[in-house]
Amino acid sequence: MRKWRIEDSEELYNITGWGTSYFSINDAGHVVVTPRRDGVTVDLKELVDELQLRDVASPMLLRFPDILDNRIEKMSSCFKQAAEEYGYKAENFIIYPIKVNQMRPVVEEIISHGKKFNLGLEAGSKPELHAVIAVNTDSDSLIVCNGYKDESYIELALLAQKMGKRIFLVVEKMNELKLIAKMAKQLNVQPNIGIRIKLASSGSGKWEESGGDASKFGLTSSELLEALDFMESKGLKDCLKLIHFHIGSQVTKIRRIKTALREASQFYVQLHSMGFNVEFVDIGGGLGVDYDGTRSSNSEGSVNYSIQEYVNDSISTLVDVSDKNGIPHPNIITESGRALTAHHSVLIFEVLETATLPEWDDEEEIAPDAHELVQELYSIWDSLNQNKMLEAWHDAQQIREEALDLFSHGIVDLKTRAQIERLYWSITREINQIAGGLKHAPDEFRGLSKLLADKYFCNFSLFQSLPDSWAIDQIFPIMPIQRLDEKPERSATLQDITCDSDGKIANFISTRNVAHYLPVHSLKKTEPYYLAVFLVGAYQEILGDMHNLFGDTNAVHVSVNEKGYNIEQIIDGETVAEVLDYVQYNPKKLVRTLETWVTKSVKEGKISLEEGKEFLSNYRSGLYGYTYLE
């Protein structure tokens, strides 16, 4: 058998599929990141080792701002190419919806690099609007205001507009339009009004119901006519500058996007024919990320189109309908936050220990006085072959069930139960191995690989770092960052360190269907074993919660230059004291309470003075330490 090669690992984990030129494997068998086009790479294993020397413990979130820059450039260049190809005469504006990742360093990097690319920000709530107005200092960039609005929200936006901000208030419900009219009159400002239209078209994938008739936001055709009449009656006809639609996040099929664009383009035409000179068409989000690298519309974690195809269809549809009707090309706004941010963050954590189902030692023989069920099961295992495996499987299941029943009634002892378990799982392993080599294996054996997978216990919280994996079964690319020149001989599911049975990952990307285990290597005592979760830059940080009071992880900003990489910033993860404070425990009061209790215990002779000091020292250091295992 030939030696395992790096190319085998590339195929096994499909890194060339989902890595989109950012992630690959080097000759040392380590995952490397290539954030920019100049080819400078970052070896993740070397980076993690250096961070460990700096006392930065895993789990850690690595952010690569150069990837953010590259994503902005990529999207902008796609629009430029499409504009030239289709004769597009208006402007394109890339808008970043900060709900995707509101972390200040992320937003500031996007604003800083996006200035020359017409990049603006979107706010979907009052707190987000406060952030957006303050950080977006470029008066030429757009601010789009979505979400539900009250008077204070609208007043803040209108006053910011009055001071020079290019702000668009997008009407989600009819009552918002009335509030905008009222506040605009009070403040003596001509508002930039947008209207979100509820299309009949919907997206595809997990967020399909975000669009279409069942969508949460937007005006129906009847409500739109009512809104137009209202604006005309209030002298606001010239204030309608923008129409907006959104058919859902992570749209998997380009055909759904094309259908929505055709429908929305007719609203643009109809409004112009009615004398409403709309200047902007905001086509919303939906531009997907190929999480599994299959480029398949059948997978909820993939998309069957490229950024260029998405942009080509957007521009060509609106150019075509505008030219046919003799109206100006609209300025096109895109809100593609997921596509901008997903690739720039990588979560790294260490495997702490493993658990494997028991198996029978080949050298072990059955004692003459062993229970008859043990002897029967041993005989099945000893004579197992391909011709007998289905019958053997049925017999083994029956014997195990009988043994468990007898144990529950106190008839079979613990030693016998343990022997039954080891023999049963050894039979299961051997049957799975035989079935794996068959072209047409019995259906009963399909789930055996999942059943037999090891458990790898990892130092992270699924709920804090990968909430979409738990909440909506989102599949992220996961693989080791080292030893990729070695064949992974184990199969495992991943378990986090929360005290919750839901804290596990049992679905992984595969070039065929979803896999229920991850190929991994056996642990070595001499070195830590790290796994990485990729494409986690969108939504995960902000949606994460503190289940079991596991807080934010350490975060590291890594940039590249011609000499290599540079660790720009290390942001410490939350301490135990910080997360306790969130749930209204005062750390200082906790320490005082413990000091009183320890003093009392020392006086009563329960512990010595030195033991009391040691306990308090451990408590204080733990209180101001990392919430994860160190």
UniProtKB/Swiss-Prot annotation:
Keywords, ordered alphabetically: Decarboxylase, Lyase, Magnesium, Metal-binding, Polyamine biosynthesis, Pyridoxal phosphate, Spermidine biosynthesis
GO biological process: arginine catabolic process; spermidine biosynthetic process
Catalytic activity from the UniProt record: L-arginine + H(+) = agmatine + CO2
Segment forming the signal sequence: none
Binding locations of substrate: 281-291
InterPro entries named in the record: Ala_racemase/Decarboxylase_C (IPR009006), Arg_decarb_HB (IPR040634), Arg_decarbox_C (IPR041128), Arg_decrbxlase (IPR002985), De-COase2_CS (IPR022657), De-COase2_N (IPR022644), De-COase2_pyr-phos_BS (IPR022653), Orn/DAP/Arg_de-COase (IPR000183)
Sites of N6-(pyridoxal phosphate)lysine modification: 99
Gene3D superfamilies in UniProt: 1.10.287.3440, 1.20.58.930, Alanine racemase, Lyase, Ornithine Decarboxylase, Chain A, domain 1
Entry keyword Endoplasmic reticulum: no
Enzyme class: lyase
An example molecular function term from Gene Ontology annotations: metal ion binding
Listed EC numbers: 4.1.1.19
Alphabetical list of Pfam families matching this protein: Arg_decarb_HB, Arg_decarbox_C, Orn_Arg_deC_N
Essential cofactor(s): Mg(2+); pyridoxal 5'-phosphate
Highest taxon listed in the record's lineage: Bacteria
PANTHER family in UniProt: ARGININE DECARBOXYLASE (PTHR43295), BIOSYNTHETIC ARGININE DECARBOXYLASE (PTHR43295:SF9)
Similarity comment: Belongs to the Orn/Lys/Arg decarboxylase class-II family. SpeA subfamily.
HAMAP family attached to this UniProt entry: SpeA (MF_01417)
Functional description taken from the UniProt entry: Catalyzes the biosynthesis of agmatine from arginine.
Name recorded for this polypeptide: Biosynthetic arginine decarboxylase
Lineage: Bacteria, Pseudomonadati, Bacteroidota, Bacteroidia, Bacteroidales
